């Protein structure tokens, strides 16, 4: 669903209106965890809670970014981002737009991102990759994984070290990992449930676990977004 709009954005206050109606926007830092029950009433996409619904976007969609200097381009890249709100883990691999450094300097949190004069996302975070800046265009990405899950415990994201692989909440050299996983035939009944996130430059892994027993293991395309705006 695209949002038909007459968008008004105040760069000084960050206030956004569509058709004269104020839009609620809360942008999270990459990986941020918050506890605020009032946010449950809003739509949540990776890195943002808002009162509007963003459409699904495909790789290659051409978008315009609201800046004082202007900015536009195609979403030819993707990146992974997430936040946790009231124990709800909201994550996804979303389209991203490569932007030059001089445009990044003019970006404003919450500024509209449009496609054919319709609101499709908001400026939320950027990622430095291979000498370029990627601006994520957060939404439910068409043809790629996004979602949410309730979780009781979550550790901080960890880098997958060279020569290691992941099982459950741990990473080990591959041969050791195979033996470790083989020993975990079933979880202890009283074991705590948890969620773990691991990443490298190109991939993100999410595991859902009961103790050290792995219940589910997802491999998703990266990179993991690592920069908000200061």
Swiss-Prot record:
GO terms for molecular function: 2',3'-cyclic GMP-AMP binding; nuclease activity. It is an enzyme of class 3 (hydrolase). It comes from the Viruses. Its EC number is 3.1.-.-. Coiled coil: none annotated. The record marks 88, 219 as: Substrate binding. It holds the Pfam family Baculo_p26. The active site is at 43 (proton donor), 174 (shared with catalytic histidine of dimeric partner), 178 (proton acceptor). Disulfide bonds: none annotated. It catalyses: 2',3'-cGAMP + H2O = Gp(2'-5')Ap(3') + H(+). Keywords: Hydrolase, Nuclease. The substrate binding site is formed by the N-terminus of a monomer and the C-terminus of the opposite monomer. Nuclease that cleaves host 2',3'-cGAMP. Belongs to the poxin family. Homodimer. This is Poxin.
